[in-house]
Amino acid sequence: MTVYTCSPDLASILTCIYEAWNSRLGYRNVRLMTEPVGNLELFCDYCHVEPDTEKAASVTRSIQKKIGAAAWRLVYLCAMSERSDAPDIIYRFLLYGFSYGKDTLLS
C-alpha cells in the first residue's frame, strides 16, 4: 500500500490526487491523507507530495469538464474540512465521478 500525504490545503490535496492517479497503482493500492500523519502502518510506503499549481489546475479542469460544477463544489467543500482522510474521500469520489461523468450526482 502506498500512502500519499500532503498539506491540508486545496492545491496540495489536488496535487496529491493527481500523483495518486498518475501512479497507476490502482485504487486498492493507494490511500491519501493530510499531514501530520498520526500512526504509521507497517508495510506501507509513505510518499509526501509537494503542491504543484499546474497539476492542481489540471485536476480542477478535469472535474469541471467531465463531472460538472456541482461536483467541483463538493470537492472544494470536502477539501476545506478538517478530516485527515479528506484527500482519500475526494479521490474515491472522483474515481466514481470520472466513470459516470455528468450523471454522477443525479438520482
What is the role of each PLM region?
Residues M1-E54:
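N-terminal ordered "arm"
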Residues E41-S107:
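Charged, alpha-helical interface segments at or near domain boundaries
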